[in-house]
């Protein structure tokens, strides 16, 4: 059982990129397959700083001002009058994040003697970014622009780093919509072609680009948008993604949200039962996002047993349900250490 890895979703409350990356390595270095940057420019607010940058760039303007106390109360944007939104108008910041982190990553990897470690760059899907920035009308009218801007950065990062990077696609809006419409989530997935859209984003990137997929239910201010009744919506969406995934863009992992913000993972075996139907391809790891600060370690060990019994095998890695950037630093450090301890059980 010691072969389980540890996965960090991305954000971490570090004072700098180096501080965040060192903290994650200190907690679980030998168990890490990928090392995120910590997303220290945006760790607390996730997509909000990206959208605010787009306003500053003149690509978007405020349509309806919100408080951002929750994603439901977010600010909604539109394209300025007389302009047509294109990918060339938008700098999403991912390339700059990779450029800043690359030297730090290479130095830390060499110092820790972890030659197999890969840099991880997280980015929301085009659907999620358009949905959060502009609502459903934005998805309908402007998704291509967000896709083009995202693919431009993926291409540039691939050229910069080569095979030493995994791009983590973060499908928050897709997963929240699936969970909210349960038990009608299959109809929603078919109507909006959510899995197809995630796979199509990968297919638009250069051949050989390595990916992971983080299916997320949100954690703004450590509050989730939704709590699943069981894991059926996750399994259905993950299987849809895998079925349509391009064969020449390796899908290295799928990460599942098994907790929900401040709500700990379920103690009901039935919640995890749909994992028996999860159909990942060979070479795609399953990362269980259940590490949480509310239960005791002993309770979390029991939860891990429920997950693995439902899955029918050991998980490939353990993780929190979302990034640790919305948590105070002492809690983030404790959760990182807990992940390592649970992986070792």
Go through each PLM region and give its residues:
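N-terminal basic, low-complexity leaders that serve as flexible interaction/assembly modules and, when applicable
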Residues: 1-71, 107, 344
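Catalytic-face loop-and-helix region of soluble metabolic enzyme cores
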Residues: 243-345
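Active-site-proximal, glycine-rich beta->alpha crossover segments in alpha/beta enzymes
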Residues: 69-162, 166-193
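Acidic, His- and aromatic-enriched active-site or binding-groove loops in soluble protein domains
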Residues: 59, 63, 140-153, 184-205, ...
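Active-site-proximal loop/turn and secondary-structure-junction residues that shape catalytic pockets
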Residues: 125-129, 171-175, 217-221, 258-262, ...
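Conserved, mostly hydrophobic/aromatic
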Residues: 150-151, 213, 254, 318
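Aromatic-lined glycan-binding groove of carbohydrate-active enzymes
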Residues: 194-283
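Acidic (Asp/Glu)-rich catalytic clusters
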Residues: 25-26, 69, 104-118, 158-162, ...
